[in-house]
Amino acid sequence: MNMPFLPGEKKLLAFSVLLIFFSATAKYTFGQTLSINDSGYFEKPGVNILVFNSQYNGMFFDEKTAGIEIIHHGDRTATGGAVRLQNTPEQWDLIPKLVSRKVDKAANTIEVAIKYEEFDFTSRAVVSAKENGIEITVWLDKPLPQKLESKAGFNMEFLPSAYFEKTWLVDDKPGSFPLYPSSNTRIESSDKKISQFAGHNTFDDRGRGEFIIPGPLATGRVIALAPEDPEQFIRVQSTDADIMLFDGRNLGQNGWFILRSLLPSNKTGKVLTWFIEANAIPGWKRKPVIEFSQAGYNPSQEKTAVIELDKNDAPLKSASVFRVMADGKTVERWKGEVKDWGRWLRYNYAKFDFSSIKEPGLYYIQYGDQKTNTFPIDTAVYSDIWHPTLDVWFPVQMDHMEVNEAYRVWHGAPFLDDALQAPVNSVHFDGYSMGPSTQTKYKSLERIPGLDVGGWFDAGDFDIQTASHCTALLSLVDASEKFKISRDETFVDYPTRYVDIHRPDGKSDILQQIQHGTLNVVAQVKFIGHPVRGIVVPNLHQYHHLGDASDETDNLPYDPNLKPFEKTSHSSGRMDDRWAFTGRTTFLDYFTTAALAAASR
């Protein structure tokens, strides 16, 4: 039954509908036009777009920190905007060299030229502020080289963790970002693959001469990423090419989600246009970040917190320190002045001194509506924070040993097939290389005996770096001598190559670690004649290994007389044994001498 409106009810209803509409859409607006700031990138509140402010480097290649990038509501969620040669480039795929970069603030345009020297292929990208986003146009002065047809395309990569459990619309067709990679792939012959750095290969094809090509999750002309999330909503559209959405994690766990359009063959001039809009929440400012010692403070030391602020934010006049009591209540113990420090790079900074608090207890800092986690103030605050480093971290890094902790085996005994002489005139990865001489009595790929003992893994990798060993040995000796450390929480048994964490064995752990690091360095000097740059796996598909260190090689010494992947009880035809890069330097000789002299004490 229809009920008549009372006087004024229609106006009230209309107002209510408008209020609901504007409340629902207040966080969804592509907002004002981007403009180039004094730092040379596009900016508006909530959105920064960088155009090759950072370049690809020749050490670790694609580190996801170069090309056209988007910092979206304080988080860098897009990177790698550039012409690339693969659907989902891996870290060691070829990277372009920046030839030129021109910033025209008056025209609100940034132009870059990049070149793949391996193919004598140069492209230009012109990035211009347009309406509420940016327009990217790709220009070619010469047609694509034939080898790059159906391979060269414009890519932009998006951080997976920012889009997990979110959705997309591709030409209005819905989909969702997968938590685990699950898109289609296909196999192609290796002769169709563009070579990676120095001819190395990230893919272990088991001798089949093939490689993987990921297929797209979706394809269309207009792609909306996370349209339901005002902080992550980005829309990308093209009028002259399809845009494909890929999952880079099919090839590497460090892969990102990728948008990509192929460049056309036999065409010059403007060959591709993208228009990108990143949603900007009106009035958005990055929340203050309070930086302090999470380990805590000694009562007598200076205590200063650093407060990092949005460039459009100004420091509050004061901050407070609250003490957490045993009954769960909190009491304000100090309210002090916040002093403006100034601007550095992207942020404003302020300092908050609370050195006057000397009473032991648990505290937190309150700045506006931001609150830190709890930290202690106590005379013994630093007395045991080093225990996890000696108890767990160092044992886990122990090479050539099985390492156990309670129910967990961190890794089996690895690299029992160490090591082969690195071949001359070889360019390796991770900075390793060999010149025209081995500077040893060993020939290229000849076995060097006695190196399967002692040492630690390098940070993040499973290679041995001798200079890092020397630094660690000197630090451990210094700590042992100054602080008389006798802590014993690690069981080490060399006859069985076994380490057990949290299990005392009656010996000083720090002395055991000094011994373990020294063993490998001494073996180098004994069997090679001098300390070496390092010992590392020969294949790139081994180097990015993320599993148990003992699975990076087969632990069987390489025998060139066996067929590839053929094994006996004591040898293998698989060329996976680590290589010793034996170039000699005066610096490393003296550094090692100092470390061994210290360890001998």
Name every feature range the model reports, one short phrase each.
Residues A162-V170, G283-E302, T372-H411:
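Low-complexity, Pro/Ser/Thr- and charge-rich linker/hinge segments at domain boundaries
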Residues V453-A459, A523, H530-R601:
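Active-site lining segments of carbohydrate-active enzymes
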Residues F30-V83, S183-I213:
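Beta-strand-rich N-terminal accessory domains
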Residues E135-P181, K371-V381:
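Acidic (Asp/Glu-rich), glycine- and aromatic
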Residues R84-P143:
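Extended, loop-rich substrate-binding clefts of extracytoplasmic carbohydrate-active enzymes
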Residues A305, Y367, L473-R503, N520-F527, ...:
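Well-ordered alpha-helical scaffold segments within catalytic/enzyme domains
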Residues G207-W284:
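Beta-strand-rich recognition/accessory modules
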Residues V289-S318, F322-A326, V331-A380:
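Ligand-binding face of N-terminal immunoglobulin V-set domains in extracellular IgSF glycoproteins
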